[in-house]
A protein has these predicted regions:
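Intrinsically disordered, low-complexity regulatory regions
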Residues: 1-91
């Protein structure tokens, strides 16, 4: 058990991420191109992720009822940035 309940928070983040993919891009596998894939192909995906991290972090506390959602988006874009930075290949 972590002092700050990181394990529980990571489970919540995982549930959020899973839900984001359930509602998008329905169809066969070849039709599931995401904006992130296009941005990666032109070399701007990291900038996009960083911009969204800044946007949602800056918005935190300013939209009633959206604080949790904003933080989940920050964490999701941080995970994506980690992936696109190739750190997950450093095992």
């Amino acid at each position: 058990m972590n002092k700050y309940r990181e394990n529980e928070t990571l489970k919540i983040v995982q549930e959020y991420v899973d839900k984001t993919y359930q509602g998008h891009y329905v169809g066969d596998d070849q039709d599931k191109t995401q904006t992130l894939d296009l941005l990666e192909s032109i070399g701007t995906v990291s900038d996009f992720c960083q911009s969204n991290i800044i946007k949602y972090a800056a918005r935190f506390g300013k939209k009633n009822g959206k604080n949790k959602q904003d933080l989940l988006k920050v964490m999701h874009y941080a995970i994506l940035l980690y992936h696109f930075s190739k750190f997950d290949n450093d095992h």
